[in-house]
Amino acid sequence: MRQILFAAGIALAVSILLTPVLIKAFSRQGFGQEIRVEGPASHQSKRGTPTMGGVAILAGLWAGYWGSHLIGIGYNADGPSASGLLVLGLTTALGGVGFLDDFIKIRKQRNLGLNKTAKLVGQLIAAVAFGILALQFRGANDLTPGSEHLSYVRDIATVTMGSVVFVAFCYLLVSAWSNAVNLTDGLDGLAAGSMSLVLGAYVIITFWQYRNACETSPGKGCYDVRDPLDLALICAAGAGACIGFLWWNAAPAKIFMGDTGSLALGGMLAGLSITTRTELLMVVIGALFVAEAASVVIQVAVFRSSRRRVFRMAPFHHHFELAGWAETTVIIRFWLLAAIASAIGLALFYSEYLAAIGG
């Protein structure tokens, strides 16, 4: 438990202290956000706000994770694990793709960075590497970081994918989650605040899996998850980094996370869902991100078939802005929705445990 607190605290401190440094540095370099002309008129005032703040989130994540392990040496805590390093690597790789996207936008002074093909190739390389490695590194109880079974709260024994389909599934999750978080990052603090809530829920889930792991506590309801405590450190560091960044990203934002942050955080959600065996549960806990992405899919599909729009603008947080809601009202209410989704997900997680032990 101490390591989890250290991870969150270090990440928060690094993120909250580094972000204003980045604001000044990026402002001097002219690394400002370009705003879509077709977006809400109120957003035009945000043009030039420093972007690529995801660098601070990644720095906080790395500092929190490795710092907690360095402190853990003092009381013989377990070191870094395959699962933790894989999620950290996937997160960083997606952050690298996002950084390139942001940098191109800034250099060309437009709101379009990497083309769709280049971005998809970057996501593909990261996801395939993650998927292949996730089936290696067998640990106690012959567990690997990933599983060829589809999972809800734990593996569903009757649904087996096979290694090739599993790797393809990893790409689907990485692409879906990274793009979902990217689409959500359209209002000040919306993505960072929502991610803090989701990762906070996953701190609870991974710590519970650690306390009830089949490796150390075999019995009814135990969890076959490799390295749950190390995954808890990743979640805690991620949550701390997001909260620290949110201090400066809250409305009116002094800096945006950019694709550097949003793609990285989406990659983290994908990696955590796979390594914790909660791929379907993540859809519930991350329901806000799912809804934002779904609103875009619905808008495009309906418009192409009927030339009519379901929403005034997609993603649908802009729909409410154009309906007259203040930006801060949309943000706070969406945070509440993210909190409700996280609470429902935790309730489902615990109710499954009670059912498993016959409670």
From Swiss-Prot:
This is Phospho-N-acetylmuramoyl-pentapeptide-transferase. Its cofactor is Mg(2+). Its EC number is 2.7.8.13. One of its GO terms (molecular function) is phospho-N-acetylmuramoyl-pentapeptide-transferase activity. GO terms for cellular component: plasma membrane. The gene is mraY. Its main location: membrane. It comes from the Bacteria. Keywords: Cell cycle, Cell division, Cell membrane, Cell shape, Cell wall biogenesis/degradation, Magnesium, Membrane, Metal-binding, Peptidoglycan synthesis, Transferase, Transmembrane, Transmembrane helix. Catalyzes the initial step of the lipid cycle reactions in the biosynthesis of the cell wall peptidoglycan: transfers peptidoglycan precursor phospho-MurNAc-pentapeptide from UDP-MurNAc-pentapeptide onto the lipid carrier undecaprenyl phosphate, yielding undecaprenyl-pyrophosphoryl-MurNAc-pentapeptide, known as lipid I. NCBIfam families: mraY. It comes from Rhodococcus jostii (strain RHA1).
